[in-house]
């Protein structure tokens, strides 16, 4: 189930994105990217519709996934 990111409290959204970024451990190449920069990138992707927040009823978990998968 897709959860509209606009319906999530700002502090909760920030923590959700932070947990996602830290869990993913994405390699940004030779350039070091700050945690806040990574969080801002995910926020931009949410606003543009590139990614969505997804709740799994089966596993009772929340994740951020590429919107095209749905």
From Swiss-Prot:
InterPro entries in UniProt: UPF0270 (IPR010648), YehU-like_sf (IPR036685)
Family: Belongs to the UPF0270 family.
Alphabetized NCBIfam families for the sequence: PRK04966.1
Protein name: UPF0270 protein VS_2853
